Amino acid sequence: SMLKFESVETNCNELGIEKNKVIAYWKDFDHIFRNRALDSLEERRIRKIYEYRMDSAPYEWGVKPVPKIESAEKLLKKIIQDKSSLCRFGDGEFEIMRGHIRPWFQSVSETLKDRLIEVLNSYEEFINIAVAQNFVDLDKFKERDADIIRAYMAYDTRKDIINFLDMKRTYYDAYVTRPYILYKNKRNAERLFPLFKKIWKDRSVIIVEGKYGRIGIKNDLFDASKSIKRVICPPRDAWMFYEKIKQTVIDIACRNDLICISLGPTATVLAYDLAKIGYQAIDIGQVDNEYDWYCMGADKRTSIKGKMVAEIKENNELEDFIDSKYFSQIAAEIY
C-alpha cells in the first residue's frame, strides 16, 4: 500500500540513501492515477466555454449589430406612467418559434408558433414588446449564468433570433421579470421589485397562473394591491386551453382591472389579445419565484415550499398546500 511504501522511503532516508536514488513507482509524481477520462471531459468543457465566449464577443463588444433593447427599469417606469401592457419573448418563446421544444411545460404547436410571430411583429403603442437581452452587457450576470446564455446563443440560435427581430425597432428587456437570481449583486432587484409593486398598488388584480404557481402567497409582493382574483390554469400545455382561458378572464375582469399572467409562452399571446380589446395585461413570468429567492437571500435557484419552480425538478409539497387566503381568491379553475 501507499502507506507501507512511505515507510520504506523513510527507512531509505535513515540509511543515508539519497532521495533522488529512490524510484517510487507507486508515488503519483506525474498524476498517473488521475481519471484521464474525467480530465478530458473537463478540458473539453472549459474549451467549449471559451469557444462560446469568443463567439459572443463581437456582439458583446459592439463589433457586430445587435437589436436595440431598453432597460428593464425604463420599461417598468413606462408601464407605471402610461398603464401599457407587456408581452415577453425569452428562450422558450423563441424556441417554439423555431419549431423546437424548450420549456417542458409547453409542447410545440404550430398555432402557438404563428401567434407568437404575430405578436412579435405587431406595432401597438400601448403594448410593449420585450426580448431577452442575451446580446450585450452579459458581465452583469454571474459568470456561470452568462456562460449558459452564451452557450444557448451559439451556432444558429443568435442568427435565428436576430432574423425574427426588426433591427430598426426598440424593444425592452424581457429579463425584467428575472431581476435577481442571474445577477452578481442585489442592486438590480432592489431597484425593480419596488417598481413592480407600484404597478399594482391600489389596483384590482386578476392573476392568471398555473395550478401550482400560487403567486404572491407567503410573500408581500402583491400586498399593496386593492384586491386579487385568480384564474387557475393547467400546469402544462396551457395553450391547449387557450380560448377557454381567455374567455374566462374576459368574463371575470372589469375594464380597470390589471391582469397579471404567468403561463409560459401562452402568457405572451394572452397579454397581447387582452390588451388589443382594452385591458391592461402584463406577462409577469416568474417574478414571484425571483422575489421569493430575493427575500430568502438565495444564491442559486432553489425549491420554494408549496410553489412550482420551472427550473427545479424537485418541487416541495405542491399537493399538501393549505392557505385559506389563496383559496378564497380563486375565481375560476380551468382543467
What is each model feature region?
Residues 204, 227, 280:
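Residues at the starts of beta-strands that form the adenosine-phosphate
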Residues 136, 235-237, 288:
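Residue-level detector of flexible, active-site-proximal loop/helix-junction positions
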Residues 258-261:
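Short catalytic-loop micro-motif centered on adjacent basic/acidic residues
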Residues 211-256:
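A mid-sequence, solvent-exposed acidic-amphipathic segment
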Residues 266-335:
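C-terminal functional extensions of proteins
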Residues 3-222:
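Electropositive, gly/pro-rich neighborhoods at or near active sites that engage anionic ligands
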Residues 133, 232-234, 285:
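Residues at the C-termini of beta-strands that transition into short coil/loop
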Residues 70-72, 111-118, 241-252, 266:
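A short, acidic, amphipathic alpha-helical segment used as a generic capping/interface helix at domain edges
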